Design a protein with these regions (language model features):
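Bacterial N-terminal signal peptides that target proteins for export
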Residues: 1-9
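Bacterial Sec-dependent signal peptides at the C-terminal "C-region" and cleavage site
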Residues: 5, 15-30
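Generic detector of short alpha-helix boundary/capping microenvironments
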Residues: 9, 31-32, 97
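The two-metal-ion catalytic cores of nucleic-acid processing enzymes
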Residues: 12
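An acidic-aromatic substrate-binding cleft motif
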Residues: 28-62, 67-77, 82
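Aromatic-lined substrate-binding rim segments of carbohydrate-active enzymes
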Residues: 63-130
Length: 130
């Protein structure tokens, strides 16, 4: 399997892991659809109110506080990039530890009642050196 296919496979596994953790309050799987004029979350109109957080730029001990600040401002979603040049600095060597632990960040968002909108790299529009 070439490097590109390994990377695509890993991204798909990450997406499946994130989605498998998404449950509504009753414990059953939720739904997200595009309605005629709005998004529908579990069959009800849903407006995405999103803030963007660059988890790799914030010390881990401040992650939850930043998520809570976004929620206090009325947001319901956190947009995050997967900064791929941080997670795979050398071909085939992946780092999702410490400040790079994107899954831990997603779990904190979920714990605080927030949704995640994941935008995988390699390109990120945030003044980030490739």
């Amino acid at each position: 399997m070439n490097h590109f296919m390994k990377t695509v496979t890993l991204l798909m596994v990450m997406l499946i892991c994130v989605l498998s953790g998404c449950k509504n309050q009753s414990g059953s799987n939720g739904t997200f659809e595009i309605g005629d004029k709005t998004f529908l979350l579990n069959g009800k109109p849903f407006i995405i109110k999103a803030a963007e957080i660059h988890y790799t730029r914030i010390p881990v001990e401040y992650w939850e506080h930043r998520i809570q600040m976004c929620k206090a401002l009325g947001m319901n979603t956190i947009c995050i990039y997967a900064f791929w040049n941080i997670h795979e600095q050398k071909p085939g060597e992946f780092d999702f530890s410490g400040q790079n632990d994107i899954a831990a960040f997603c779990r904190l968002a979920q714990k605080n009642g927030m949704y995640i909108m994941l935008r995988p790299g390699p390109y990120v529009c945030s003044e980030w050196e490739m």
